[in-house]
Amino acid sequence: MKTLHERPDYVLRFDKPKNTEIKHINGRWYLYERTTVYDPETGRSTKKSGRMIGAITEDGLVGKRVEARALREVVVVEAGATQYLYRENGDIRRLLGEHFPDCRRELFSLAVIRMVQDRALKRAEAHYETSILSAMWPGLRLDGPSLTGLLRRLGRDRLSIRAFMRSMAGGGDRFLMVDGHRILSASATLESAEKGYDSKRRYKRQVNLLYLFGIGGDGRGPRFYKKFPGSITDDGTVEELLREAGVEGEDCTLVGDKGFYSNENFDLVEELGLGYIIPLDRGSKVLEGEVPPSHVGYGSAFSFRRRSIYAKRIEGEGWVVHLFLDPHLLAEESADLVARLENKNAGLDKKRRAEHKRRAKGKGRLTEAELAALEEIPVIEHVGDRRVMGTIAIRTNRLDLNSNQVYAIYKERQSIEQLFKTYDCTYEFDASYMQGDFAIEGWLFLNHLTMIMAVRVLDMIRDLGLTDVYSLDDFTQHLRKIKASKVDGKWYPTKVTKKVQALCENLGISLGSVDQIIEQERASAP
């Protein structure tokens, strides 16, 4: 039986045209065409509904919009990660505008794309077209030929690159860490790619990249880089790096690694008026006769990340050496040494047994001296007085710092180690196919921008105590799932999964209006 619905006042007031009828469907009222058709079999005329004309509302008849909906513009793009990086890196956008006004949008877009999507420049244009970047800055030319020209122009302008990096540092860093990194190159036209050894003992064509990493009131991050030919070692490049970066003044302290230790480098940092915190080799003459036989002789102790650290102070002229004993490190090094000696003894025993079997058959190969050399190594005697195991010695001219502070600052070198780990593993920036030194200079600057953004995300995760929960990959892969849809000229956020929503809540990420960003960028366009 057909259900009758009570018609509201606005339907009753509606002036229904001739040859039409009103229907109630799913709680709404619609106007349909109606025709009369004669049926010859029954000899009667029957009413037949035609197409829907429109919906009847309180404002009157709203015409059918099926055709309009089919033709209206609907665009879906990545918005989450890009929107976050846009809001959190306003200083980068501002300084790019100051130093690279003609290509600031391209540079920022490429840095974001390479962090969020793909490091390969050949796919940058495709990612740009499916990102909210294409709505913020329409018409950017990121095709292959355009990017080749951009990198070369950028690489020729080392002065602007240097000015940008100096501006980013801003003089607020209290501590600067210096370290080198090697980038393999397959390019035969790259003059700075020369054969040399790196930390992995690879003797290949490579570029030596030296980096300064800052820690100060404005947070942490990569501050300055300079490339050198691959045949040049790090200790021969530090002076040029520091002078070009404009590093000087007693308010800044340089934190180096063991490769930095040399009298020339100490003279350099003192000439620049810098403080320094530099680790020494365990065989350094300064430590002769100074290493206590046990932790009792160290004089002081403190805890660091739930580990007991013992410390001894060795005074010098204008400097001091802090000698540290880490019992946990001592146990690890002792276990490693004993294991290596045991493995070596097992190998000696195998060779000794084989020789005895051959001699039993009258086929011995070794001399008596060679056989005697295969005798088992007394493990405990070989370990002997290894009092330097588990120790770290650090020289500094910062006489105002105590042992606890010096140790904590030096351990921040893990920051730059994390930087290069991200450089290699996450973004695979350790090999370059750039053709020419200008192109690789531009490529390195793009890497630098991306790494600034990445380190800021890592620091945000670390400050929240969530490094065991979220990685940089988790951040980018989840946030780039947040899309924005453009319907009839207006942007709307799409629904997100529970995992994405949980990440945003845990990291305190709240994304604002996409339209607001687009309007802001259009207003600032030249």
Language model: regions and residue ranges:
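Short amphipathic alpha-helical "interface-anchor" segments enriched in bulky aromatics
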Residues: 405-434
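Short, basic/hydrophobic alpha-helical segments
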Residues: 165-166, 235-252, 263
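Short helix/loop capping segments that flank catalytic or ligand/cofactor-binding pockets
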Residues: 41-42, 120-123, 135-137, 185-188, ...
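Basic, amphipathic alpha-helical segments enriched in Lys/Arg and hydrophobic/aromatic residues
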Residues: 436-458
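Active-site cores of enzymes that catalyze phosphoryl transfer or operate on phosphate-rich substrates
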Residues: 118, 164-229, 350-388
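Acidic, metal-coordinating catalytic cores used for nucleic-acid/nucleotide bond scission
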Residues: 255-264, 282-285, 438-439
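Dynamic "connector" segments at or just before major functional cores
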Residues: 1-177, 181-189, 211-231, 239, ...
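An anionic, glycine-rich sequence signature occurring as long contiguous blocks
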Residues: 224-227, 272-409, 477-526
